[in-house]
A protein has these predicted regions:
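Short beta-strand segments
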Residues: 16, 79-83, 144-145, 197-200, ...
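Non-catalytic, solvent-exposed interaction/assembly segments
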Residues: 1-110, 152, 162-164
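Active-site neighborhood for divalent-cation/phosphate handling
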Residues: 81-183
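Oxyanion-binding/catalytic loops of NTP- or PPi-dependent enzymes
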Residues: 39-44, 48-49, 133, 182-207
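A generic structural signal for beta-strand entry/edge sites
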Residues: 21, 33, 136-140, 203
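Short active-site oxyanion
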Residues: 12, 140-142, 194
Length: 207
């Protein structure tokens, strides 16, 4: 299985590839606070990214390379996110006694029950959640899948600029973690927040 979730890794750049631009962010941690060390953005040529899918990997790679020259960071590991119609996420239930490897094998065998694509076409990952509230001895498992091409094009674009994709996350979950981080830093109460709104150049998403 390919990693689609955020795994712990130090010194990563966050690179957001949208339909109209690329944004790069580098954070440093001081105590329990985070500080923006570098931030830069560049517009993308029309048609380089269409409906959140990279259509022209060379153009995207060139713009990321220009960002790399601009920010002059020594960090080469990067985190990117996938989203759109090529991403599938759902919660399934598996036997709680299974190890992660056994869960992986079972998901592969039963993949056609959860994913409407051939296994050859997708990258899959999963994350063990809480015990099932309905079925004793079962555990909820968050299953995520994305068209493999969508992942590989992002990896290729980063490599063209000299970066390595250490994390390929799902945009909605990356947004959730970013909100958690910001709410803790700004002393906000999550209970008072009813929605998160992402206002982009061509679309607005409400989480």
């Amino acid at each position: 299985l390919l990693s689609l979730f955020n795994k712990k890794s130090k010194n990563l750049l966050g690179i957001d590839i949208s339909s109209s631009s690329i944004k790069l962010l580098e954070l440093s941690k001081q105590g329990d606070k985070y500080r923006v060390e570098r931030y830069a953005t560049r517009p993308l040529p029309p048609g380089a990214v269409v409906e959140k899918n990279i259509a022209n990997v060379e153009a995207v790679g060139e713009e990321i390379e220009k960002l790399a020259t601009l920010v002059k960071t020594k960090t080469t590991g990067a985190a990117v996110a996938v989203s759109g119609s090529s991403v599938i996420a759902k919660t399934i239930e598996l036997n709680a006694s299974l190890t992660d490897l056994e869960m992986e094998n079972q998901i592969i065998v039963e993949a056609d029950q959860y994913i409407p694509y051939s296994l050859d076409e997708v990258a899959i990952d999963f994350e063990r959640q809480l015990p099932s509230r309905k079925n004793e001895g079962m555990v909820e498992v968050l299953l995520a899948a994305c068209k493999r091409e969508n992942v590989e094009l992002r990896v290729d674009a980063l490599q063209m600029a000299g970066y390595e994709a250490m994390v390929v996350d799902i945009e909605a979950y990356a947004m959730e973690r970013a909100f958690k981080l910001l709410s803790e830093q700004m002393d906000l109460s999550p209970e008072g927040i009813v929605a998160i709104m992402d206002i982009g150049a061509t679309m607005t998403t409400i989480y």
